[in-house]
A protein has these predicted regions:
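Short, charged recognition helix plus adjacent turn
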Residues: 1, 38, 65-80
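A short, Lys/Arg-rich alpha-helix, primarily the initiator
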Residues: 1-20
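Residues within the helices of the helix-turn-helix
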Residues: 12, 23, 53
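Recognition helix of helix-turn-helix/homeodomain-like DNA-binding domains
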Residues: 30-46
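Short, basic-rich loop-to-helix N-cap that marks the start of a DNA-contacting helix
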Residues: 43-57
Length: 80
């Protein structure tokens, strides 16, 4: 799995845990719905830390909590 896929799955997982929609997350985090739709739709594999920080703020979690998931433990090497 690459980092983009892991970020996408983590966002969807956190929305499910919080019982909110992706659109609601966009609203509460100040990220545009199109940006979040691109991430969760797999059309953006290079999400910035700044965007992830905004999402974390909207979810009231730290960046550390965001990345504290099995999804990020065994990522593919990006540079070969």
């Amino acid at each position: 799995m690459n980092i983009g896929e892991a970020v996408k799955l983590r966002i969807l997982e956190l929305c499910k845990m919080r019982k909110i929609t992706v659109n609601k997350l966009a609203t509460i985090s100040g990220v545009t719905q199109s940006t979040l739709s691109n991430i969760t739709g797999g059309r953006n594999n290079s999400t910035t830390i700044s965007t992830i920080k905004k999402l974390c703020d909207g979810l009231d979690i730290s960046i550390e909590e965001f990345f504290c998931s099995e999804l990020f433990r065994h990522l593919e090497q990006e540079i070969k």
